[in-house]
């Protein structure tokens, strides 16, 4: 095989290795992450379900404190079984009555308060769902950024591979290199194409995951994520912020309030209900009768009905309080984890930007120069080239990791929005 043929074959390999990778991405920019978040918050079916549950809970506040419907009754009061005595016997009458069951004072207010507390739990769950969805979009966006930066590095590696191919061809043409170097250069081009193929497949999976959050077709394309927005971390203790602003803590705190209201309702259920009624009695030719009724419920089965319900409500309140303490502990632990990950990300970013990335570039240049001068081995060139690729891909991943930490922290410690209807 001639030297010219080897050089030509190597050039063709370098030029076509990446061209056979499927799923090439159009040169379009992806929407900003905030645009995608707005789209997700507007379209998400899971969020819509939580919103519907909150609306349903709010609709139940007014009915919770409503009185029972009144009862209309018609009564025939006849003396004797043989004759119709209405109009002829004083105590005989045909009456129409309206009776209204009345709740013990405080029961209606307690029931409304409990329903309001249940709605507040659902409102806190809605805020949790919104924050979770927002964090998911941001984290996925950050991973896509890392994938797109790595893709750019792999595509740019084609130019470096061309340069290495020229170096190998020059040495081989001069009889200063073995065919092994030519094959290794070709192999490296194929391996870069393999990495790019895997990367694009992984990117497609991430885009499909993002499309699910946006409630759009899984195969809907997404342009290149060219950059991440700045991540501004809050000042002060993240653990304190997580304890006061954490959405899971808010849900647990609202659950404690709801459990306390439920206990109050259970205790009031031990009080007797009342009833009142009024009616008129028709007595034929005799004067009509005025009927007034007032009744008091006798809580005869209190030991078997109301008191067990009170004890159960007390246990449920204790459970809710324990779950609140656990939610606070989880929030503090999550904040501590994010502190450690943020510090790690900052250190590693500094290390990659100021040391590893420039060092790998210098190593590739030095290895190529040594090989061209006949002082080095081509395996060293390939090894340094792979380090160069990995360093740039890892730098993008470290940037992605730092942004993901910020996204999770925002979901954990961002101030809760003002309640609906509050005016500044």
List each language-model region with its residue ranges.
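A glycine-/polar-enriched beta->alpha junction
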Residues: 38-48, 55-70, 85-88, 96-113, ...
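Bacterial N-terminal signal peptides
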Residues: 9-20
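Acidic, low-complexity, intrinsically disordered peripheral segments
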Residues: 25-30, 392-424
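Amphipathic alpha-helical coiled-coil segments
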Residues: 49-61, 129, 133-154, 163-170, ...
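Periplasmic alpha-helical coiled-coil/stalk elements that build and connect Gram-negative outer-membrane
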Residues: 2, 31, 129-244, 338-341, ...
């Amino acid at each position: 095989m001639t030297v010219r043929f080897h050089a030509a074959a190597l050039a063709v390999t370098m030029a076509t290795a990446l061209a056979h990778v499927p799923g090439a991405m159009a040169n379009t920019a992806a929407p900003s992450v905030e645009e995608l978040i707005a789209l997700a918050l507007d379209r998400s079916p899971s969020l819509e379900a939580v919103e519907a549950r909150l609306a349903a809970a709010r609709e139940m506040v007014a009915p919770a404190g409503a009185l029972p419907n009144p009862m209309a009754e018609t009564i025939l009061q006849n003396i004797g079984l043989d004759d119709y005595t209405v109009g002829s016997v004083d105590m005989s009458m045909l009456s129409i009555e309206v009776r209204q069951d009345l709740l013990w004072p405080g029961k209606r207010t307690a029931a409304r308060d409990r329903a309001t507390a249940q709605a507040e739990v659902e409102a806190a769950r809605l805020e949790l769902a919104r924050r979770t969805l927002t964090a998911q979009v941001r984290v996925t966006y950050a991973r896509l950024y890392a994938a797109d930066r790595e893709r750019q590095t792999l595509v740019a590696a084609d130019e470096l591979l061309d340069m290495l191919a020229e170096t190998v061809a020059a040495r081989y043409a001069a009889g200063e290199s073995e065919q092994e170097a030519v094959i290794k250069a070709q192999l490296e081009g194929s391996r870069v194409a393999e990495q790019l193929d895997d990367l694009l497949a992984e990117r497609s999976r991430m885009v499909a995951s993002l499309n699910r959050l946006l409630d759009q077709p899984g195969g809907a394309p997404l342009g290149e994520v060219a950059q991440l927005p700045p991540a501004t971390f809050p000042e002060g203790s993240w653990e304190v912020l997580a304890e006061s602003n954490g959405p899971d803590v808010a849900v647990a705190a609202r659950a404690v309030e709801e459990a306390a209201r439920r206990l109050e309702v259970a205790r009031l259920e031990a009080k007797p209900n009342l009833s009142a009624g009024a009616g008129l009695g028709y007595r034929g030719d005799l004067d009509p009768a005025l009927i007034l009724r007032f009744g008091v419920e006798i809580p005869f089965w209190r030991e078997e009905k109301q008191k067990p319900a009170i004890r159960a409500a007390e246990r449920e309140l204790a459970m809710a309080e324990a779950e609140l303490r656990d939610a606070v502990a989880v929030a503090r632990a999550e904040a501590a984890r994010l502190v450690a990950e943020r510090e790690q990300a900052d250190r590693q970013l500094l290390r990659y930007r100021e040391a590893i990335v420039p060092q790998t570039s210098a190593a590739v240049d030095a290895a190529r120069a040594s090989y061209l001068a006949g002082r080095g081995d081509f395996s060293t060139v390939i090894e340094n080239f792979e380090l160069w690729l990995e360093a740039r891909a890892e730098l993008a991943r470290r940037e992605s990791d730092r942004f993901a930490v910020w996204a999770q922290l925002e979901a954990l410690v961002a101030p809760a929005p003002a309640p609906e209807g509050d005016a500044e």
